[in-house]
Amino acid sequence: MSQTDPLTVLQDSLRGAPIIWKGEYPYFIHPIADGIPRMEAEVLRATRDLIVSMVDWSQIDLIVSVEAMGLPLLAAVGEATGKPTVVIRKRSYGMEGEVRVDVSTGYSSSTAYINDISPGERLLIVDDVISTGGTLEPLLESLEGMGAVLQDVIVAIEKGEGRVRLSEERPEWPIRTLSRIDIVDGKVEIIQ
C-alpha cells in the first residue's frame, strides 16, 4: 500500500473484502475484523492513528477492548499512548469482582468476563466492528453498572444499524466509528 491519509488507507483496505454468508447474515472478511486475510502494517497503523487523533487523552485512564479482534487495536493504541489496557475475555478467571456479560452478534451468542476495572475510571473502549450492537450494548451497560465512566467509544468499522440504534436509545454513550460500510450485491461499499 502507498502512503496516504489514514482514513483512505482503512477504506481502501475494505474495498474488495470477501463476503461469506452465515445463514441470512452477510459477513465481510477483513484483517481488522477477522485477522485474515493478512493485515498490512499500514492498515493497522492507519487505524491506530485515526483512533489516537480522535481522543482527548487527558480524559482517559484506561483503554478497554473485547477478545479477540479488538486486541490488535487495543495493543496498538495502548502502545502509542502509553495508557494501560484491559482485555474483556471470553473465559472466566474467577477473580474478585469479575463481571459476567452475555453478548450476541448477528450470527452467534457468547459470554464475556470483565476484570480489573474500578469505579470512576474513565474508559476508552475500542473495538473492531459494530453491526447489530449486540456485543457492545451489554458490555457498555455492564461497565456503567461497575461504576466506570464511558468517556469514549471508538469502533473501527460500522456495518448495519447498531450504532445508530444505540445512539438513539442511549445518547449519553459516546459511540463513534472510523468508517461505515454496507454490503450491496455481495460487495463492500464505503458509506463514509
Predicted regions and their residues:
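Conserved acidic residues
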Residues: 61, 121, 151
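PRPP-dependent phosphoribosyltransferase catalytic core
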Residues: 4-6, 140-192
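Conserved G/P- and acidic residue-centered "switch" motifs that form tight phosphate/ATP-binding loops
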Residues: 128, 133
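Active-site-facing substrate-recognition patch
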Residues: 1-59
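Short glycine-rich phosphate-binding loop at a beta-alpha junction
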Residues: 60-67
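Solvent-exposed alpha-helices and their adjacent loops that cap or buttress functional pockets
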Residues: 57, 114-118, 146, 167-169
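Short, glycine/charge-rich flexible loops or terminal/linker lids adjacent to PRPP-binding catalytic cores
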Residues: 80-123
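Short Gly/Thr/Asp-enriched flexible loops that form oxyanion-binding sites at enzyme active sites
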Residues: 72-81
